[in-house]
Amino acid sequence: MLNASLRQLSSLLSEKKISSTELTGEFLARIKALNPDLNAFITMDEEKSLDQARTADEMIATGQSTLLTGIPIAQKDIFCANGWLTTCGSKMLSNFISPYDATVVKQFDQVGMVNLGKTNMDEFAMGSSNETSYYGPVKNPWDRLAVPGGSSGGSACAVAARLAPAATGTDTGGSIRQPAALCGISGIKPTYGLVSRYGMIAFASSLDQAGPMARSAEDLALLLNVMVGFDERDSTSLQREKEDYTQDLEKPVSGLRIGLPKEFFAEGMSSDVSSAVEAALAEYRKLGATFVEVSLPNSKLAVPVYYVLAPAEASSNLSRFDGVRYGHRAAQYANLEDLYAKTRAEGFGDEVKRRILIGTYVLSHGYYDAYYLQAQKLRRLIAEDFKKAFEQCDLIMGPTSPTVAFNIGERCNDPIQMYLSDIYTSAASLAGLPGMSIPVGFGSKNRPVGLHIIGNYFREAQMLNAAHRYQLATNWHELTPPEMNR
C-alpha cells in the first residue's frame, strides 16, 4: 500500500478493501517511526487526521466520494490550516495557530483528502537545502548525509520516504522542482496564477506558486485537477475554463518537438547529471520525439535577476512581522522602535535577514533604478527568450539541478553556491511559465537526478503527458530508497 499510486489507493478505498481510517493510521505509524530521523514533518495532530479519515469513510459509505476521498496528503507548512500550527519554518511564527484555511487546503478538504500534518521547509521558503528551517534540517531519504533540496524539502522527503502518498509544495525560484529532483520524485509548478495563493504565506508575490508533489506524473495530474481554479480572494488568480489534466496522459508523444537550450547544457552541470539527462532524452527519441536546439541567451542572468527581485518583494512582505499583531514578540524592549528591532532580530534566521537586507537595499533611493528597475527589464527579456524558443518547439527540457544533492552543511557558508542550485529553474519562474521535474536516474553516491520539463503558458497537460509516457517506459519513479523500503 505504501507504494500504491493514488488511483490504486482510490480503488482499495472504493472497493472497501481498506478504510481511510486504517490507511491514515498506517501512514501515521510510519511517520512516527521514521520522522524522528528524517525530520520531514514539523507538526502532526493524530486526532485531527483520524477525524478527517472517519469523515472520508462516511463520504465513501454514502456515495459522496471523489476519486481522492480518503487518501492522505501532507501539507507544506506555508499553507494556513484552520486550528493547525502554521510556522513557515520560522521562530517568528512558532506559536501561530491559523484561524482559517488556505484555499489549497480547503480544496483538498472538500474532496475528502486527509491532512497528515505540516511538512518542514526552509524558513519563509528562503533556501535551496531545507537547512534554514528553525526546526532543523530535513535529511534526504536516499542518503541521510545529503540535503533534500528546498524550500519544499519536507514535502519531497515525505513522498520519497513513503511517509505520505502526496504532498503540497510551493515554488518561487525552483522550490518544488529542485527538491523533487534531489529526492527522486515528481513535482510540478503550474503557470503563475493557476493555483490560488490565498492563505499561502507570501515570500515573493509575483513569483510564488503552489503545486503538487507525488511519485508520478499521473498522480500530479489528479492533484492538479483539484488545485487549479479561480479564487476571487487572490488578486493574481486567473479565470480560465476548468481542465482535466488526466485526459491526454496516454496520448503518444511521437512528433513532440523538444527544445534543448544550449545554455542549459554548458559548463556547470556535473557529468553524472549530464549522463542521466542524456539517457532520458534518448528514451524520448525512442518514443518518437524530435529535438531542436534553442537559445535562451538571457537565462544566464536569471539567478542574479531572481536574487534582486525576490528579496525586494520579501522585504516588503515580511515587514508585517513586527511583534504587534501576531507571531513572536520580544520579551524586553525600551520603546516601539526597539520592539520592532528586537522582535525581528530574534524571530528571523540569518538567511531571511540577509534577503531582507538585500531587498531593502535594492529598493532604496539611489539604487532602485540601478538594480530593481534593471532586473525588471531583464525579467521581460527572459520571458521574450522563452517566447521565441516556443515558436520552434513544444516543450523545453534539461537538467533540474546542476548537481545531485550535496551534503548537509556543505554550502551553508557559501550563499553564492547555494543560490546557483536554482540556475536551471529560476528562469521559468521569472517568466511565469510552468515547470516540472521527474526522476530519470541516479548520479554519484546513488543520489537521484531530475529532468526539468518547461512548457508554454497553460501547457501543463502537455507536460504531464510527456512525463507520463516517459514513466510508462521507465521505472525510476517507482523506486523507493532502500532503507525506507520496509
From Swiss-Prot:
It comes from the Bacteria. It holds the Pfam family Amidase. PROSITE patterns: AMIDASES. Allows the formation of correctly charged Gln-tRNA(Gln) through the transamidation of misacylated Glu-tRNA(Gln) in organisms which lack glutaminyl-tRNA synthetase. The reaction takes place in the presence of glutamine and ATP through an activated gamma-phospho-Glu-tRNA(Gln). Belongs to the amidase family. GatA subfamily. Heterotrimer of A, B and C subunits. This is Glutamyl-tRNA(Gln) amidotransferase subunit A. It comes from Nitrosomonas eutropha (strain DSM 101675 / C91 / Nm57). The gene is gatA.
